[in-house]
Each structure stands twice: as structure tokens, then as C-alpha cells.
Amino acid sequence: MKAIKKSLTEEEYLYLDFSHQTKGCIFPLHTSVTLFLLSYCDCKIFKICLVVTKEVSTDSSLLRDDLIQDVEIQIISRQELPPIVQNCCLPAVVERSDNFCRAGLAVVLRHIIQKSYEADPLKKELLELLGFKKTCLKACAEVSQWTRLCELTIPLAIENFLRESSDQPPTIPVEILQLEKKLSEPVRVHNDDKLRRQKLKQQKADGVGPPLTKGKAKSKVHTQETSEELDSSSESLELKVAFSKLTVQEEPATTNREPSHIRKAKASDLPPLEHVFAEGLYFTLADIVLLPCIHHFLVIICKKFSEKLVEFPLLASWYQRIQEVPRVKTAASKCGIQFLHLPKLLTVSTEQRPNLSEVPGVEGHSDPLFIGGPRPTMAKLMEKGIEVMFSPHPCPTWTVDWNVLPAAVSPKEGKMSSDRALRKQQQLNNLVYVVTNQAKPGDRIVDFCSGGGHVGIVLAHMLPSCQVTLIENKELSLIRAKKRSDELGLSNIWFIQANMEYFTGMFNIGVALHACGVATDMVIEHCIKTRASFVTCPCCYGFIQNTSKFNFPKSEQFKKTLSYKEHMILCRFADQTAVQLPPQRRLIGKQCMCLVDLDRARAAEECGYSVQVISMEPESCSPKNNMIVGVPI
């Protein structure tokens, strides 16, 4: 084995799934996307491992044409994965210490970009892939439509399309049409007004565009246009702005004010900005993810069903434009992607275009209007025998002996005031008591939405015979938790930066302190799937809403009594428990919290659990002081 040169940073291993391959494409598409980003960033700082099943040939020569050129890739079996990675969905990145893992496509891709920039700080354009405020694909798929589109729906839809394609004209995946619809929507950027006024000025200088009084009519027909006009002129405002970002060049600041008729133009009269790339004007990580997926989709379409291209002209135009981005063609070539050229297929008449208004949106729900207070809803529940009811606290006076524990165990070590740290200790007293009374030697405990690790670190220290795993989507919070753990020398703790759904391991107890909105429901569902006990303290009731996974109310008992709108009214008022509110209002908020959590408890009971809704002690430890404790029967 060749000697590995020591570096200033800890060596990291990147693990990618491999199921099968076709010409120029490795499946699953998450792997193709990851390899394409590595090629685009010219990143060679990871030790790359392709993970295959026993049924797949491990002859690397068969894969060479579709892998990145000049990059060494090791082929291993799933049994050879480090234990922490065996508990996660791939792709995954793990440090050599084997106790810190990043899992899931969006998390791994963002990490690759960050590490590539750290390896070569001159490549500032790589950071631009993360978008405005560096938030591109940062939120989890459950709350971000772009993360869900890029990480889940588009790759899965195209994999199914490629698997099922035959000689018969196929049905275009609805996810493709949803993406086409998004490309037809007006662009929204942080400096929207400034750019639209610049565009208006440019249009007037070029003698194009309608008079200002007809600006609204222009906006109405925008969604029926393709990007044909955008492509026809390299001097268009959108392209100038987009490519200045790609080369990290700032346009010189102008000291001249805009003409009076431009400054005074109404916002409704300004021309809309047109999509240059997926999310709007700027080339981002979303484009990187979509490109390999859309390319392999178009290969089949052009080969067998070219007449279908009329159904997504904006997507075809985006595909052409993205090839002009610096380094994209080189990166694609290294990954075995041979771009298609579709110049004649972009000139599509208006009559041939599909009616995108009939395409369902990416979001499958809309928030109901909130009218009135919660009392009618609460009275309706009482008529059905459903009342506010808390189970007695098992030991309201029990506390962790914080004085004898190492300083790094206490939340006082975190960046918070002494009053807040005291309340955090009180919250932990409640959860730790329940968990320590349930846990047995050898149990695996998972701290979901762990944040800075306040719960998980205490449990790992107090239960050395148990394995504790912290799962958190925010990198900096998890890094702080690992630093505290390292100070304590804990050897029974894992750190996983991922959406909780990418944790696939078995466990015995799931814990979550103040998991926001539907995250509490995701934790409970995850525990029920593995028949694990759960101890959760919900938060952010106002963020609860129907999602692709959950519909509210959840339990059959509540469904028979309340509509979704009535349940949302309870959630809205459940958030009104802040200490500065009047006592009567806080009481109603506490009652609404209890009813929302009783619905969660009843739903878990329908799945074979014994569940209690308990009020934490003292109640002043937090405005959100409910605790839902469930044990499989």
C-alpha cells in the first residue's frame, strides 16, 4: 500500500453507493451527482470508496469509463464500512476518527464545496455555489422545497423513468413538469428591485419592451415565454449578472443616479427577471445536482421520443445554457457525460407548449386562514370526551447532581446566560430521569435534533455502558458538541450531521429536546418504526402543518372530531405561552399544547405504544414544557 502523505487536516473518507451502471451513468444518481461535483471542484482531498453489494461485480475496469479520471477510487463491500457509516444512508463522509459522520446528499455536497475551498482559498467561486447567505440546500428536505426537489424527487423520478423506459412513448414524470413550472416563475433575489430597474433602463436604451404603463401586461405573459430571447443576446442583464458571479467579479459601482423615470417607476411596472439557472440568476449547487439527472433523462428522450421535448422548453434551454458555465464541460467530460445539442428544438411555438397551470405544485398543501380563537375547537373536543389531561410526573423533585459532574457536561459550558443555563439544566433533569430509568446496559440511545449536544453528552457521561448517537442537521452545533465530548474523553458517543431520516440504524431509546414543529412527529415516527421508546419535548407548535409525510390531526380519535383547519388553530394558540403574555392567555396556550400532544400520543397508542403527556418540573424551565413519553407495549 502506498504511503499516505500527512496533511494539516484530518483525512476524510467519502463513501458512495453503487447499484449498477449504464453508458455514462452510475446508479444511484446520488453517486453520479457527487462524482460530478468532485470533478467540477477538482477535489482530490477525499479517499473515495464505492460501496457495492455482493451481487455486483467488483471489477474496477468496468467502472473506469464512468468514474472521474485521475482519481483513485477503492471498491468495498457494505460489510467493510465503518460502524457509524453502516447506520447511515449514503453518500456519507467520515473522519478517520470514525465517530463523526456526515450523511445525505445535500450535507455531503455542501461539505465537499467547503473542503475544496479550504484546500484552495483562491477558488472563491466555489463558495458561490452555496448561494445567497450560503444557504443553498442547507435546510432539510422536509421544510425546503428545493432540497426536496434536488435530493429526493428529481433523482428518484428519473431513476424510475430510466428503469421503465421502453419503445412506447412514456409519460413525462410530473417532477420534471414541476421543475419546468418553477423555471417559468418570476425570479426572486435579494436585490430584486435594483436589478429590475437596471433591466428597465437597458430595455429603454435598446428600444425594446412596452411603455411603463403596460408593465403589468408584460408580467402576465412572462410565464408563457421561453428563454429564447435570453439566449439570443450575450448582453442581457441576467446573463451579465449571472456570469459576473461565476467569475467572482463585482461590477464597478456607479455613482450616477438612475434617470428619474427609472427611479420613479412603480414596482408593478418593472420587467420581471428571467431564469438563467435553476434557482434564478445564479449558478448554484442546485444546478450541479440537477445537471447529471436531467442529462440522463434527455439522453433517453432525444434518442427515442424527441417529440416530447416540446413539453419542457425552459428545461431544455437551461440544459443548453449550463454547458457554457466555466469548467462544466471539462467536469462532465471527466465523468463520461457527453452533452447533447438541441439548438433546433428550442424554437417551440406557443401553441405546442404544455399548460403548466395544470401541473401540481411542489408544495402539496396550503395554509388555511386562521379566524377566531381556540375555545370553539376546545369545546368541540370536550363534547367528544377529549379534555386537557396530563399524566403525573414520575419524580418531580429529582435532579442531576450537576456539582459533581465535569464542567464540560453542564450546559453552562455553552454560550448562554447563567439564567438560561439553569433552565436548561432543569429541562435536562426531566429527560435524563426518564431515560436513565428506561436504559439498560448495551442500549443504543439516539438524541435527535441534538443541537449542541446538551442532552446526548449528559446521557453519554451518565450511561457509559450505552452507545449514544447525536443527530443534527446544523454542522456548527454538532462540531461544538464534539469539542465538548473530546474534552470529556467520551468513547461511547457518535456524531452524525444529517437529516434524521438518513439514520437507518437500530436503537432502543429516542430522545428529542425542543424538536421544532413536525420534527417532533418525525422523531416519534422514527422511533415507532424501530419499536424504540421515545422521550420528546415538542417546540414551535405554530410551525406544524401538513407535509408530504404527515397529515394532521394524526390520531383517528382527533380526525373524527377536528378538521385540519381546527387543528391548526390549536397549534397557533399553543405557541402563545411566552412569560410576558397575560396569565390567562398562557393558560389557554398550555391547554392547546396539551391537546396537540394528546393527538400525537393517541396516534402512537394506535401503533402499539403506551404514551403519557407529562408537564416538566418546574414548569418555569421553559414555555414549551410538555414531555411526551412512549414505550412499546
From Swiss-Prot:
Transmembrane segments: none annotated. Keywords: Cytoplasm, Phosphoprotein. The modification Phosphoserine is found at residue 233. CDD domains: GST_C_family (cd00299). InterPro entries: Glutathione-S-Trfase_C-like, Glutathione-S-Trfase_C_sf, Methyltranfer_dom, SAM-dependent_MTases_sf. Residues 130-332 form the GST C-terminal domain. Residues 190-232 are annotated as: Disordered. GO terms for cellular component: cytoplasm. This is Glutathione S-transferase C-terminal domain-containing protein. It comes from Macaca fascicularis. The lineage of its organism: Eukaryota, Metazoa, Chordata, Craniata, Vertebrata.
